[in-house]
Amino acid sequence: MYQVLYRKYRPKVFADVYGQEHVTSTLKNEIKENRIAHAYLFTGSRGTGKTTCAKILAKAVNCENSVDGEPCNECEVCKGLDSGTIYDVVEIDAASNNGVDNIRDLREEANYTPSRGKYRVYIIDEVHMLSTGAFNALLKTLEEPPAHVIFILATTEVHKLPATILSRCQRFDFKRIQPETMSVRLKQVAKLEGMELDDDAAILIARIADGALRDGLSILDQCAGRSKKIDSALVSEVAGLAGREALYKLTDCICTQNSSSAMTVISELYQNSYDMERLCVEMINHLRNFLIVKTVKDSRGLIICTDDEYNSIILSAENFTLENVIFALDLFQDALTKIKTGANARVELEMAFVKLCEPKLDVNIDSLVDRISKLERAVNRGVNVSQQP
């Protein structure tokens, strides 16, 4: 049976975990110095390596031949944990096992000594989903666990955890993986799989994945199902993106105040089954790039794209004033909010573009122009503007 890429290339040692060196180096040192905590909390956005690091840690503390804090993956314990024939590492999904009874069963089970390794390790994923009663039941065990037990809690929403739980765990915050780091890993995997992944496509996948390497590998997997030669056009098609050309066409329509052309582009995208909500998000990200180049002197490091695309962004942004960009961002953010609450996505997008192409239609612009005119007249008369109501 075919194994998806993110499972096939899941790291088995800390050295293979990308973008989380601040976490892996600390964990390795703790294992080397035998300063292993009784409870760990791994928090961060999805796809950043929390569960992967938890599994590596569980193997490393039980490994018979651990070297430099890493599991050897060759001893009987490592192989048994990988194959599931040794049951000293228990993975629990708190989303479906979130009741008091589930935690009470866990507490009773934790009293048994490990069958083969040194520790019984409990990995509780999505721990924020536990009920209040379940947290209370877990509290005492976290405070005074048996010497042979280690808890590893993983969550994407650490703010939902009680302070009493947080204070009893050693916390590690997983960062979003940088696009440059992710694109390197994607190209490595593509090469191993016999794919041709160009630089533009790798950067685009990293941008869509938004810091989650698992998502990036899933997109790469989808693209490989279509073709072994992967370019940015294929990635855009697979991910349902409008593509750079469409975004630049739409921004040109705003510059020339051509609402008719904007409607035509939106209609073509809609007929080709592009997601209108996704298009709204893409426009926000596209205009955000304009905002960055117009406000930051050295903006290259803040924009995720190739050098050619960066030059295109700079050229296109010259057609907008900073005020225009901020106003457009406000309109699209407002449209996105309405779309998420159930409004018709296509209509909201069309309204936003018409307002941008026909500024006088927006009453907010009229009121702003009127206020500016009043302030200018006050300044000309020598009135202290700061004292005006």
Task: Give the location of each predicted region.
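P-loop/Walker A NTP-binding region and its immediately flanking N-terminal helices
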Residues: 1-171, 189
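Extended, largely alpha-helical regulatory/partner-binding modules appended to the mid-to-C-terminal parts
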Residues: 23, 83-87, 102-108, 118, ...
